[in-house]
Structures are given as structure tokens and as C-alpha cells.
Regions:
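Conserved phosphate-binding/catalytic region of the ribokinase-like
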Residues: 17-21, 69-187
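Conserved beta-alpha-beta core of the PfkB/ribokinase-like small-molecule kinase fold
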Residues: 2-79, 85-86, 95-96
């Protein structure tokens, strides 16, 4: 959202550049909102402007096509990967997430649930993913594919719990709720 207009666009780009130069891990979710942009073309260009600085990226299937011009989200994920990120997660709503690195590509299925409101599902997924990612206390390059898949499973669990309730923020589950859900579902 901060890439939609100046001065936040320049500030975001500069912050990402400085963070990258300092060795920080850069996570990116373009969070495309059509009404905030003058055109779809401007949105695509603006959102693509920071991809080369990104280490881990989450996009929806729609965003992946918009940012790359590809016709499938699988091809789009590979094109995004070629632009800089080391890991791309393409969220697919109730179908789960496609997780792609240079060495791996795997569909991580969603947990089946009765969706009441999908507001916040993508943000919840990414928050859950990043929370699990950070819990490993490892550099991205040191993580195994199974650990990265576990991050996606956790993200899917958070999103699954989120869509069961109304409202984006009130529906976000606690860490204890997520862990209990994972324990009961995966046990």
C-alpha cells in the first residue's frame, strides 16, 4: 500500500534499499487494492519496483499475474523468483498456497473450513508464515524445505482460523489457538 503514491513510495523504496544494504531480510506482500491506483498498469509498475530487493514474497494468484503478465500463477511465481526473491508464496484462497524456491515448487493445501468472511485471510496467512519463519531463528539460506513448508502450513492454519469469523482484525487467532489447531489437526 505504501507504494501507491509519493512521498510514501520513495520512503518505502529507500527504507527497503537501506535495510537490504544492512543485511536485513526483506519480506514483501504487494497487497493490491485497485481503488488506490490510477490504473492497473501503474499498479503493476509500482508494485514491481521493489521486487529486486525482496527475499521472501507473498502474492495472491491475481497479483502474481498482474505483476508478471504471465497466464498461470505457476509461471508467474517462477518469473518473480527470477527477479530477486529467494522464496515466493502464491496464495490460492481455499486451495492453499504454492511455495516456490529455486530448488523446489510445492502446493501446500489449505485446511478445509467453513469460511464466514475472507477479509484478512492473506494477511493472516503471511503473518502466520513469518511468525513460524522467525521462530526457527535461522537465515533463509539455512532453512530446509521442510521448515519452509511448515511455515506455509502454519500460515494456512492462521488463515483457516481467521476466515471462520467476521472482520479482519477481530478474527485473527492467538498463537495458542493456532498451536492447538495445528496439534489437533495434524496429530
Amino acid at each position: 500500500l505504501s507504494l501507491t503514491d509519493e512521498p510514501s513510495r520513495s520512503a518505502t523504496w529507500e527504507a527497503a534499499r537501506l535495510a537490504k544494504a544492512a543485511g536485513a531480510l526483506i519480506s514483501y506482500d504487494p497487497n493490491y487494492r485497485p481503488p488506490l491506483w490510477r490504473s492497473q498498469e501503474e499498479a503493476a509498475e509500482g508494485m514491481k519496483s521493489v521486487v529486486s530487493l525482496v527475499d521472501v514474497m507473498k502474492v495472491s494468484d491475481e497479483e502474481s499475474l498482474l505483476l508478471t503478465g504471465e497466464t498461470t500463477y505457476e509461471k508467474a511465481a517462477l518469473r518473480l523468483l527470477a527477479q530477486g526473491p529467494k522464496l515466493v508464496a502464491v496464495t490460492l484462497g481455499g486451495d492453499g498456497v504454492l511455495l516456490v524456491s529455486k530448488a523446489h515448487q510445492e502446493m501446500i493445501p489449505a485446511f478445509r473450513t467453513e469460511a464466514v468472511d475472507t477479509t484478512g485471510a492473506g494477511d493472516s496467512f503471511w503473518g502466520g508464515f513469518l511468525s513460524r519463519f522467525l521462530s526457527y531463528e535461522k537465515e533463509l539460506e539455512q532453512m530446509t524445505w521442510d521448515e519452509l513448508k511448515n511455515c506455509a502450513v502454519t500460515g494456512n492454519a492462521v488463515a483457516s482460523l481467521c476466515v471462520r469469523k467476521r472482520g479482519g482484525i477481530p478474527a485473527v487467532p492467538s498463537r495458542d489457538e493456532v498451536e492447538a489447531f495445528l496439534h489437533s489437526t495434524l496429530a
